[in-house]
């Protein structure tokens, strides 16, 4: 049961379409559900597909997964007008008063997407090696200012000609001392490291 007077830790997970946000949500749910009382909120523009995928994967019981249809720019629903997501958080807290952790996945967006501090206490940003080794040096708030940068699909690097050493050097240059992790989430690689970061940085 959460002991924080501020309520459960809220972790925002952002990143472009197809980068691996839902895979990270699934991995974190499975890694943390035995130790913490948690739920998941997903954002899609016109469907609740990501929520359905999490349910089918058995990440959490169906009642602990809520899909939000943003009906427009997914960036707006996590930043400029986060009211629809704040309402979802409030509803989950009503259903499960003992929550320790709420994971909030944004809809796919560009590198400029960021979470409102009103919505997320901790932010994870997922990028995809298949997008090319140039992605880290393109910058953007998600890459430079997220609490943890997740560089996913490392297994695809040889197939797309991406040099992970170059990506790491660019990541260090763009992020300074902020942490990052390389993952291959579909293979289960790196999930525990991300989960450990959430627990430690989030004070769980």
From Swiss-Prot:
A molecular-function term among this protein's GO annotations: nickel cation binding
Binding site for GTP: 15-22
Main location: cytoplasm
Keywords: Chaperone, Cytoplasm, GTP-binding, Nickel insertion, Nucleotide-binding
GO biological process, one term: urea catabolic process
GO cellular component, one term: cytoplasm
Transmembrane segments: none
Domain of life: Bacteria
Covalent S-S links between cysteines: none
InterPro entries cross-referenced by the UniProt entry: CobW/HypB/UreG_nucleotide-bd (IPR003495), P-loop_NTPase (IPR027417), UreG (IPR004400)
Subcellular location: Cytoplasm
Biological function: Facilitates the functional incorporation of the urease nickel metallocenter. This process requires GTP hydrolysis, probably effectuated by UreG.
Assembly with partners or alone: Homodimer. UreD, UreF and UreG form a complex that acts as a GTP-hydrolysis-dependent molecular chaperone, activating the urease apoprotein by helping to assemble the nickel containing metallocenter of UreC. The UreE protein probably delivers the nickel.
Family from the record: Belongs to the SIMIBI class G3E GTPase family. UreG subfamily.
Protein name per the record: Urease accessory protein UreG
Taxonomic classification: Bacteria, Pseudomonadati, Pseudomonadota, Alphaproteobacteria, Hyphomicrobiales
């Amino acid at each position: 049961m959460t002991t924080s007077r501020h309520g459960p830790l809220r972790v925002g997970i952002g990143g472009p379409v197809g980068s691996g946000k839902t895979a990270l949500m699934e991995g974190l749910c499975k890694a943390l559900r035995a130790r913490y009382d948690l739920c998941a909120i997903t954002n899609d523009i016109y469907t609740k597909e990501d929520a359905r995928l999490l349910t089918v994967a058995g990440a959490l019981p169906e009642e602990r997964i809520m899909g939000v249809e943003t009906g427009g720019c997914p960036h707006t629903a996590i930043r400029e007008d986060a009211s629809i997501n704040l309402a979802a958080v409030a509803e989950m807290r009503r259903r499960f008063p003992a929550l320790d952790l709420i994971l909030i996945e944004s809809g796919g967006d560009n590198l400029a997407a960021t979470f409102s501090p009103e919505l997320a206490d901790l932010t994870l940003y997922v990028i995809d090696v298949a997008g090319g080794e140039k992605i880290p040096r393109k910058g953007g708030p998600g890459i430079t200012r997220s609490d943890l940068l997740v560089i996913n699909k490392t297994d695809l690097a040889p197939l797309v000609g991406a040099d992970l050493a170059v990506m790491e050097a660019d990541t260090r240059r763009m992020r300074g001392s902020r942490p990052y992790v390389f993952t291959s989430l579909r293979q289960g690689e790196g999930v525990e490291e991300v989960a450990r970061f959430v627990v430690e940085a989030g004070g769980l």
